[in-house]
Amino acid sequence: MAVARYSETAERLMTPKPGIRKPGSDVVKSPFRNYLAYARGFLTQERILRGREFIERNAAVFDEIEMTSGVSRYVITAVIGVETFYGRNMGRYRVLDSLMTLSFDYTRRAAFFKEELAHFLEFCWRQEVQPVTVLGSFAGAIGYGQFMPSSLDRWGADGDKDGRIDMVESEPDAIASVARFLTAHGWVAGRGLLYP
């Protein structure tokens, strides 16, 4: 793996941040905002507009996916919208560099990332993709749905039926993969949704 480079960013961003402790208290509070404040950042007019465009652009794919899996186009679109703003922010880090760094230089979760690295390399080999060309998150997540390589391996789907699974360039593949992931994790068609 002589082509892989150490990624200081991956190691730094994976390192847990210290919590905030009130004086005299044993309770450690997360330095992050509460969920509702966090979620409001996703409910912008632009994100809603882009979501509608994503649904319209992929209407035929969604028709088929809803019929075969029962997963709602709105739920799939919401997942992709939160994860990558409909493909706008899929990551700018070489996945190979991130996974190599987190496998061998970040001992806290090395076993997990070694498994992810193995899945990534196997996936690239099967799909005939050069590992150094794949970009993703600092932690190695890939494509519209930000799947880790093991998830891509298990639940990646060929939505455009071209014989390949491409979560970066193919919206149909991303849509089918998110639906497959949700179905595998207990999605029940017609059941209501809960939200805070």
Q: Where do the language-model regions lie?
A:
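Functionally critical loop-and-helix segments that line ligand-binding/catalytic clefts
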Residues: Q146
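Cell-wall glycan-active module
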Residues: M1-K114, H119-L135, G140, S150-P196
